[in-house]
Structures are given as structure tokens and as C-alpha cells.
């Protein structure tokens, strides 16, 4: 019987190594060991490159191959912005470091800009109001003008928050806005300056034989509740028997301010409930120290640009039977965002959940993309061809308790 053939030692060692690798592979996948616990070369062989490494690899390739040189920081900014854009959520944004600084400035009652309030438009930003003495006023900008580009960059499809941050900037610097008006376009260059936003405006009017206090709020910025409280108390001292709370053109702001301002009209109970996938449900109640007595009638004046925190207040007062909504249907922003600061100085502003009125209505109605808003109890609309404020006239008669003429 012939003796068995002996395999070369090299072949045996090689077979052992291959077998060892196979066992390690089985250990990784069948034994639930994570590839990251293995040596680097073996990890790459078994699991491939980590996802973040693929992203960096793609940025490297774009930066080294594209025919024009693009700064690495811009590539990263654009990559993050692209991820957020894929959410197809008009309220979620990525702010570059410069944009984030300007975004935070929007929460204050003063900022450096051109002195306007705007609303979102699919083509850009629609001018709602121009402040007296502002760069925009001096440049001839009027309500109704449409900004379609900033410094040559289109605003079409850009979220309102990002678009407004592009207009703002350091005092003394120039910004060129492309304005569409009466079917024509022209570039208007303005020098940014410090702009103080009148957060609250108040006046005493008469209707139906009663003195009516009118309080207008432009934004729910930090400390806005204190100005609203002060205005209400001043009007009460002057004999106000009912109130019109004007939220037209108010695009919202801080939810905590909305709670405090609604508390000026509500003695107790629920104001708003927030719910999200990864955030605990939260209910905000009235603080229990109202300024306006229960017997005083209130009309809340709203329009299509009344949004977010404004809708929280208007919706709470409507649901609780405390006020009559006058005007047009509101914007319908039934979601809230969470701001997440990033290590590069920028930030993500991501939709984290929805909010609901005391009766459980979601203000967005049909969800993130299109909102139904709040339906007014008394429809009223201004005629842009007249200088009169027809909607305010209806609100005054509503608060005064007399019949509203159709």
C-alpha cells in the first residue's frame, strides 16, 4: 500500500489562514460580532467602507475632479443642504454658519437688514410691510413687491427662513435684490443698517358706542409678551371695553411667547399640545393670571400670512370660545422645528413634530406640505385698491358687539 502523499508545509499554512479568515467571517456575522472590533484592513475587507467615509470619498472626488475649484467647506454645506432638501419639507432647513447667525438675530426686536417684513412665495419673498426710515423705504420698495433673487442667486424654491437670512447681513454692507413688480424686473442695491422692529403697536378706537383697544403684534420674539401686557394695561386705563388683537402678517416665532401671550386672555386650561416621533408629548397651559377680564369681548384679526405661533394663539382663543376670528384663512403651519447646532457653527432646523389646538386640531390639516389653516368665524378682507382697512373695520364692529355689514 503506497504511503500517503505529504502536502507541502506552505500549502498547509495557507489553508489554515484561509480557514481562519472564514471562521472569523462566520464569527462576525453568525456570532454577531461587529466588524469595527476587527483590525482595520480586515474590517474593510469584510464590511466595506463606513458610510461617512463614503461621503468624504465622494467629496474628495468631486473636489479633485470637477473643472472648477470649489472650497471644501462649500462642498460640505451643499451636501448637508442636499440631504435636508430630500426631506421635501419646506420648513426644514440647513443654515451655514453665517446664515445661522442671522437666523438667531431674527428672534430679536432689532437686526441689521433692509427694514421689511415678508411672506414666502414659490418664486421668492413677497413684501408685506416696509418700515419708515429703512433702506427699503429709501429705495422705493413697496408692499406687494416680489424679491426673486439676492445678489444674483435665485430665491425660487428656497425656504422663507433661508431666504431672509440671505438678505440680512452686517451693517454698512450692500445687498442687491432683484425685484419683480408689474411684470418687470430690476436690481435694487441697498446698504444694510440697524433696523428696530416695532413689535407691538396699540391704539384706542370707537365702534358700536364702545371704546375698543387695538393691539397689533408683528412677531413672537423674545420678550414680546411683556410689550403686549403693557399695551393691554395702557388701553384699559384709557377705558377700553373690548379688544382687537391684530395678528395679520405675523409669521410666528417663539412658542413659549405664544403661551404667555395667550395667557393674557385665558384664565386657565390648555393652549397647545405638541407631539413628535422622538420628543415627548408636551401640553402648554395658561399661566393663570389673565389681563383681559372674562366679560370683555375679543376679536382676533388674521390673514393668510398669520402662521405658526400666531395660529397657536388664535386657535386656542377660538377653540376655547374666548375670541372671534375675523379675516381670512390662516397659513396652516401645524409643525414645529428643532434647532440642532453643528460643530461647524451652522445648524439644522428640522421639523420634529406637530402641534394641536385645545380641541385637537392640527393646524397643518393635510400635513407638512400644504396646510389648511384656521377658518375665520367672520370673513373679512381688505380691498387693496382703497386706503381704508376694511378688515379692521369688521373686527372693531365684531369686538363692539354690533351687527357686521356684509
Regions found by a protein language model. Give the residues of each.
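PDZ-domain C-terminal substructure recognizer with occasional recognition of PDZ-binding tails
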Residues: 125-126, 148, 162-201, 351-352, ...
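Terminal targeting/pro-maturation regions of precursor/exported proteins
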Residues: 2-91
Amino acid at each position: 500500500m503506497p504511503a500517503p502523499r505529504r502536502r507541502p508545509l506552505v500549502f498547509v499554512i495557507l489553508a489554515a489562514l484561509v480557514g481562519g479568515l472564514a471562521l472569523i467571517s462566520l464569527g462576525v456575522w453568525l456570532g454577531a460580532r461587529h466588524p469595527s472590533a476587527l483590525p482595520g484592513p480586515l474590517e474593510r475587507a469584510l464590511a466595506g467602507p463606513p458610510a461617512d467615509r463614503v461621503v468624504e470619498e465622494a467629496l474628495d472626488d468631486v473636489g479633485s475632479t470637477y473643472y472648477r475649484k470649489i472650497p471644501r467647506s462649500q462642498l460640505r454645506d451643499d451636501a448637508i443642504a442636499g440631504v435636508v432638501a430630500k426631506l421635501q419639507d419646506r420648513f426644514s432647513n440647513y443654515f451655514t454658519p453665517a446664515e445661522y447667525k442671522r437666523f438667531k438675530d431674527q428672534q430679536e426686536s432689532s437686526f441689521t437688514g433692509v427694514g421689511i417684513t415678508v411672506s414666502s412665495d414659490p418664486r421668492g419673498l413677497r413684501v408685506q410691510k416696509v418700515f419708515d426710515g429703512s433702506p427699503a423705504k429709501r429705495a422705493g420698495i413697496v408692499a406687494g413687491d416680489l424679491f426673486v433673487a439676492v445678489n444674483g442667486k435665485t430665491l425660487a424654491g428656497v425656504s422663507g427662513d433661508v431666504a431672509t437670512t440671505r438678505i440680512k447681513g452686517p451693517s454698512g454692507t450692500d445687498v442687491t435684490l432683484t425685484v419683480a413688480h408689474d411684470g418687470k424686473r430690476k436690481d435694487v442695491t441697498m446698504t444694510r443698517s440697524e433696523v428696530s422692529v416695532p413689535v407691538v403697536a396699540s391704539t384706542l378706537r370707537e365702534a358700536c358706542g364702545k371704546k375698543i383697544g387695538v393691539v397689533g403684534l408683528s412677531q413672537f420674539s423674545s420678550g414680546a409678551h411683556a410689550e403686549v401686557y403693557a399695551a393691554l394695561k395702557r388701553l384699559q386705563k384709557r377705558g377700553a371695553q373690548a379688544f382687537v388683537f391684530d395678528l395679520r402678517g405675523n409669521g410666528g416665532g417663539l412658542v413659549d411667547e405664544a403661551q404667555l401671550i395667550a395667557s393674557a386672555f385665558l384664565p386657565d386650561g390648555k393652549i397647545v399640545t405638541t407631539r413628535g416621533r422622538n420628543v415627548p408629548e408636551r401640553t402648554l397651559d395658561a399661566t393663570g393670571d389673565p389681563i383681559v377680564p372674562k366679560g370683555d369681548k375679543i376679536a382676533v384679526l388674521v390673514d393668510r400670512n398669520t402662521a405658526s405661533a400666531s395660529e397657536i394663539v388664535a386657535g386656542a382663543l377660538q377653540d376655547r370660545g374666548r375670541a372671534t376670528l375675523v379675516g381670512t384663512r390662516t397659513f396652516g403651519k401645524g409643525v414645529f422645528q428643532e434647532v440642532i447646532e453643528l460643530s461647524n457653527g451652522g445648524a439644522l432646523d428640522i421639523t420634529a413634530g406637530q402641534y394641536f389646538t385645545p380641541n385637537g386640531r392640527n393646524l397643518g390639516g393635510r400635513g407638512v406640505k400644504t396646510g389648511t389653516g384656521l377658518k375665520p368665524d367672520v370673513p373679512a378682507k381688505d380691498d387693496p385698491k382703497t386706503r381704508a382697512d376694511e378688515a379692521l373695520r369688521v373686527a372693531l364692529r365684531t369686538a363692539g358687539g354690533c351687527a357686521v355689514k356684509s
